[in-house]
Amino acid sequence: MNLGFIGTGKIASSVITGICTSKISFNKIIISPRNKSIAKNLKQKFKKVIIAKNNQQIVDKCDWVFLSVTP
């Protein structure tokens, strides 16, 4: 199962960290390139995290997509 996150702020970072350090089974997490510093940090921290080229790639390649953007 591939998980995707559109939005890479503090909330997405916390949720992704929680998923990656839990026993939840997933293939990879594809994240938005919007916040480059947070995205790069998550990719370095967790080997299953991949930075997408754009948000459409997240929608196309993920089974579940989480919207973590400011309303």
Where on the chain are the PLM-derived regions?
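NAD(P)+-binding Rossmann beta1-loop-alpha1 motif at the extreme N-terminus of oxidoreductases
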Residues: 1-57
